[in-house]
A protein has these predicted regions:
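Conserved class I S-adenosyl-L-methionine
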Residues: 3-71, 73-80
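A conserved beta-strand element that flanks and buttresses the S-adenosyl-L-methionine
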Residues: 143
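Short catalytic micro-motifs in class I SAM-dependent methyltransferases
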Residues: 146-147
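C-terminal alpha-helical "lid/dimerization" subdomain adjacent to the S-adenosyl-L-methionine
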Residues: 176-232, 239
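Core SAM-dependent methyltransferase catalytic element
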Residues: 232-234, 238-256
Length: 256
């Protein structure tokens, strides 16, 4: 990293520290992300390039919009929007998108994409499951993809309960993340196999980024995730488990 970029990163870290002074001393600091550090400008720039090797962002976005049954009169929160993969596509089809992320570096890239696409119906917000304050009217839907695993389990539940309050009654949540549904007795062989497969699929020189996910981040088991969603105030309409490592949930906020 160049000297100028290092200076900028130090300033951003200091700024984030000041922001979190207003929070209780016991609250989990979601701004200081665990695992791979996406607060880094360098990491943010590399994110799209890496994920495009195994994800079709446009197809994913279209499928999510269809699953949620969204239309041009509706609003959505993209919690953990990253560089705007879903946000930018969704904004072309919806009334408004609230794009939320803990990484200012990611948000900067997302804003650039929005300007390039000439989209003016996106509100970018710095925050996450625990810190984002939604001051507008409740939204029709919330989308969260590859994000919730950054929170420890207790804070996952707190974050999901906060999302419920941002949704209209009968509003919907689409949640996609790393969730373990394999037989725990075979965890070593399953994890080793997954890491080897993804290393080859992504053309990585080293599996360390994947190792970090299992070693430092907070992916959980399917039965735990289902319990969190239900206790938070959601009805699970559909749960889809893929390859024993990925899960998608379509949920509805319970009526009053």
């Amino acid at each position: 990293m160049k000297v100028r970029e290092m200076d900028i990163e130090l300033y951003r870290n200091y700024s984030n520290m000041l922001e979190n002074r207003s929070k209780p001393g016991w609250q989990y600091n979601e701004i200081k992300s665990c695992g791979v550090k996406f607060n880094s400008a360098m990491r943010a720039r590399a994110y799209d390039k890496c994920h495009q090797r195994f994800r079709d962002f446009k197809k994913e976005s279209e499928e999510i919009i269809a699953i949620l049954g969204l239309n041009t009169d509706q609003t959505v929160i993209d919690i953990g929007c990253g560089t705007g993969a879903f946000t930018i596509h969704a904004a072309k089809h919806l009334k408004k998108v609230y794009a939320v992320d803990v990484s200012k570096a990611m948000l900067r890239l997302a804003r650039r994409k929005a300007r390039k696409a000439k989209l003016d119906n996106i509100e970018f917000c710095h925050g996450g499951f625990l810190t984002y304050e939604h001051r507008a009217e409740p939204v029709d839907a919330i989308v969260s993809s590859h994000v919730l695993h950054h929170l420890p389990d207790f804070w996952k539940l707190i974050g999901l309960k906060r999302l419920v309050q941002m949704l209209k009654t009968n509003g919907r949540l689409y949640l996609h993340d790393v969730v373990f549904s394999f037989d725990i007795a075979s965890y070593e062989s399953r994890i080793n196999g997954f890491i080897q497969s993804m290393t080859e699929k992504l053309g990585l020189q080293s599996p360390e980024g994947l190792n970090i996910h299992f070693r430092q981040e907070h992916s959980t088991c399917n039965w735990i995730m289902q319990g969190f969603l239900e206790r938070a105030g959601f009805v699970i309409d559909k749960a889809d488990y893929k390859d024993d490592f990925m899960a998608s949930y379509l949920c509805t906020r319970k009526g009053e």
